[in-house]
Swiss-Prot record:
<keyword id="KW-1003">Cell membrane</keyword>
<feature type="transmembrane region" description="Helical">
    <location>
        <begin position="205"/>
        <end position="225"/>
    </location>
</feature>
<feature type="transmembrane region" description="Helical">
    <location>
        <begin position="124"/>
        <end position="144"/>
    </location>
</feature>
<feature type="transmembrane region" description="Helical">
    <location>
        <begin position="233"/>
        <end position="253"/>
    </location>
</feature>
<keyword id="KW-1133">Transmembrane helix</keyword>
<dbReference type="GO" id="GO:0005886">
    <property type="term" value="C:plasma membrane"/>
</dbReference>
<feature type="transmembrane region" description="Helical">
    <location>
        <begin position="52"/>
        <end position="72"/>
    </location>
</feature>
<feature type="transmembrane region" description="Helical">
    <location>
        <begin position="12"/>
        <end position="32"/>
    </location>
</feature>
<dbReference type="GO" id="GO:0005315">
    <property type="term" value="F:phosphate transmembrane transporter activity"/>
</dbReference>
<comment type="function">
    <text>Low-affinity inorganic phosphate transporter.</text>
</comment>
<comment type="similarity">
    <text>Belongs to the inorganic phosphate transporter (PiT) (TC 2.A.20) family. Pit subfamily.</text>
</comment>
<feature type="transmembrane region" description="Helical">
    <location>
        <begin position="373"/>
        <end position="393"/>
    </location>
</feature>
<feature type="transmembrane region" description="Helical">
    <location>
        <begin position="155"/>
        <end position="175"/>
    </location>
</feature>
<keyword id="KW-0813">Transport</keyword>
<keyword id="KW-0472">Membrane</keyword>
<dbReference type="InterPro" id="IPR001204">
    <property type="entry name" value="Phos_transporter"/>
</dbReference>
<keyword id="KW-0812">Transmembrane</keyword>
Length: 490
């Protein structure tokens, strides 16, 4: 890690430090901005004291980042066009990162100040879109080519529909709990609010089994939040390092000889597969640019030629440190192009399930070279998120706990909302889809209130919906404007 600051140019080292600080600051804001999602239901059902709940949430956020993998991280990275990543100068990369993060931070702090549970994910993805748009206009390139359209579409749909799904599932759970446990002699208390429990039984805390269910479901939300949102921080740092220090981070220089040989064998199998299927024409990678020795672009190479070029680069290579910086650029480029070809074939209508499984597995193997994160990055992101979790949480907790429904949550409502959020976010993290923890949980709470007939506070719901609608376009325009100014200043 320390080698990042060892440049002879003091200004460069300082800018690298500031870029990393911005990412970690964003992640800390994400922590306290989204902690309410995990602890609000615990606090307002009195299942756990506020400080203990927040500390517990911080611990499981940390574990979520540490153990959650990297699928979401690289979904974020690949939202930006490969040409922008591969050809950005050090100054352009810094301008890109600072503009993106500053836009997301400004919006997140603004919504936090006004107690609105807006989405950190929406703001970050909006900022990334803004960078891509500005880059397309400045370089006079196609807007269609500026984005990974399939990836952008899936991310956009997940952000739009995940709150709706959360509302429906949580509402269904509360309906089932009402149907089966409303008159149950043992579990009828699950439909009490904390105040009703105190008036009837003279106790503040929930019954033991209900309390354990609330705590466990809250742990699930915290862990899932770390696994999903923490990965976004990892992806951001890798964006910073690939753009600013490409020689060290374009490929995983710690890849061992066995893993390199696995990549070579996989390339051999892929070459054989594509030759047998004779699908050269259907795997053209679209781009109008010519090959340039200094600038690596997504040329019109077909999959077989990309594989042959990659094999040529890796011939007699047992350590990626033996590759020159230029060849590391080329290796990353070819592997991304092969991955694009695999995606096109996997999504085609003329592929059998056996071939699809083979291609998906092969893609995972070859991308290990470029889709990675050093352990120190995972640790500092986990630490930033967990520290952020332990501060600044109270403002949004009040909104989630008191201002969505017209009365306080029952134990059943809290549990239904948390179970829905933990499973939804957990599945999204596993499949590599970035989702909004904030909107999934707040919509789940609203769903339980609607089904239970308690009613919701229209003003708060309108404010949350307004923040939901505005976050993406505002952060997009803000980052686009900041990046445009930065490009002219440098």
């Amino acid at each position: 890690m320390l080698h990042l600051f060892s440049y002879s140019d003091l200004n460069h080292s300082l800018l690298v430090f500031l870029a990393l600080f911005f990412v970690l600051f964003y992640e800390a804001i994400n922590g306290f901005h989204d902690t309410a999602n995990a602890v609000s239901t615990l606090i307002y059902t009195r299942a756990m004291s506020a400080h203990v709940a927040v500390i517990m949430s911080g611990i499981f956020n940390f574990l979520g980042v540490l153990l959650g993998g990297l699928t979401v991280a690289y979904t974020i990275v690949h939202l930006l066009p490969n040409d922008l990543l591969l050809n950005a100068t050090s100054k352009n990369a810094l301008a890109m990162v600072f503009s993106m993060l500053l836009a997301a931070i400004i919006w997140n702090l603004s919504t936090w100040y006004f107690c609105l549970p807006a989405s950190s994910s929406h703001s970050l993805i909006g900022a990334i879109i803004g960078i891509g748009l500005t880059n397309a206009f400045v370089t006079d390139s196609s807007l269609v080519d500026a984005f990974n359209i399939p990836k952008m579409t899936s991310v956009f749909l997940s952000l739009v529909f995940s709150p709706i799904i959360g509302l429906i599932i949580a509402g269904s759970l509360i309906f089932l709990l009402r149907y089966y446990l409303n008159n149950n002699k043992i579990f009828y208390r699950i439909h009490m609010t904390p105040l009703e429990r105190k008036e009837k039984d003279g106790k503040k805390i929930p019954p033991f089994l209900i309390r354990m269910a609330l705590i466990l479901s809250s742990i699930g939300v915290s862990y899932a939040h770390g696994a999903n949102d923490g990965q976004k921080g990892i992806g951001l740092i890798m964006l910073v390092l690939i753009g600013i220090v490409p020689s060290s981070f374009l490929v995983n220089l710690n890849t061992n000889k066995y893993e390199i040989n696995c990549t070579k064998h996989t390339l051999n199998h892929l070459e054989k597969y594509f030759l047998e299927k004779n699908i050269k024409k259907s795997n053209i990678i679209k781009n109008k640019e010519e090959i340039n020795n200094l600038v690596v672009r997504s040329q019109s190479y077909n999959s077989i030629k990309n594989i042959k070029n990659t094999k040529l680069l890796l011939k007699n290579i047992s350590n990626y440190n033996d590759l020159s910086i230029k060849k590391r650029f080329q290796l990353r480029h070819y592997l991304l192009c092969i991955s694009d070809s695999i995606d096109k074939k996997v999504n085609s209508s003329d592929i059998c399930s056996k071939d699809k499984r083979f291609l998906i597995h092969s893609k995972k193997v070859i991308l290990k070279t470029i889709e990675y994160a050093p352990m120190w990055i995972i640790l500092i992101v986990a630490l930033s998120l967990s520290i952020g979790t332990m501060i600044g949480w109270k403002r949004i907790v009040v909104t989630i706990g008191e201002k969505i429904g017209k009365k306080r949550m029952t134990y059943a409502q809290a549990m239904s909302a948390q179970i829905t959020a933990s499973f939804s976010i957990g599945i999204a993290s596993y499949t590599g889809i970035p989702v909004s923890t904030t909107h999934i949980l707040s919509s789940s709470v609203a769903g339980t209130m609607l089904i239970d007939g308690d009613g919701i506070q229209t003003k708060t719901i309108k404010n949350i919906a307004l923040a939901w609608i505005l976050t993406l376009p505002v952060s997009m325009l803000l980052s686009s404007f900041l990046y445009w100014i930065a490009l002219f200043l440098i």
